[in-house]
């Protein structure tokens, strides 16, 4: 998968500065996953956030317009992902997607979970049998309207 030049520049500068998404999130007052989504062109920064980010990374103002313009969300490669980590999420939805849908609808009714009024957090859970990845999604429930 190839990424836009802006993504490549942001990731390179982040690596050169020895920063993590969590470090940048603290600086901006935002969650690390949201910051990563900004790097990948899936979120929109305010002018102040873009200025602070670009200054921290030592990048020029020419990226500000890209960072502050609302993107076409979900515009990543539409084929089945081949990156093993990303593919696991695809596989999880293949296995658990319908069961999750049914459980959500039993609890809430007919509707969807918002990805707009939404947060996602990734945590490391230490375990003697091998560390675990904990992903928590929290989205507003939006019932389908009848008319």
From Swiss-Prot:
Its EC number is 4.2.1.104. Keywords: Lyase. It comes from the Bacteria. One of its GO terms (biological process) is cyanate metabolic process. The keyword Lyase applies. The keyword Isomerase does not apply. Catalyzes the reaction of cyanate with bicarbonate to produce ammonia and carbon dioxide. NCBIfam families: cynS, PRK02866.1. This is Cyanate hydratase. It comes from Prochlorococcus marinus (strain NATL2A). The gene is cynS.
């Amino acid at each position: 998968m190839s990424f836009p030049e802006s993504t490549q520049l942001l990731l390179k500068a982040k690596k050169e500065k020895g920063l993590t998404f969590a470090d940048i999130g603290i600086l901006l007052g935002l969650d690390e996953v949201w910051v990563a989504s900004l790097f990948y062109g899936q979120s929109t920064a305010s002018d102040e956030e873009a200025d602070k980010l670009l200054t921290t990374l030592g990048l020029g103002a020419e990226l500000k317009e890209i960072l502050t313009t609302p993107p076409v969300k979900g515009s990543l490669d539409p084929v089945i992902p081949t990156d093993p980590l990303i593919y696991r999420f695809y596989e999880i939805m293949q296995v658990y997607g319908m069961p999750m849908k049914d459980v959500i609808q039993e609890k809430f009714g007919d509707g969807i979970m918002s990805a707009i009024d939404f947060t996602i957090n990734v945590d490391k859970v230490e375990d003697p049998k091998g560390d675990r990845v904990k992903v928590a999604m929290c989205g507003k429930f939006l019932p389908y309207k009848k008319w």
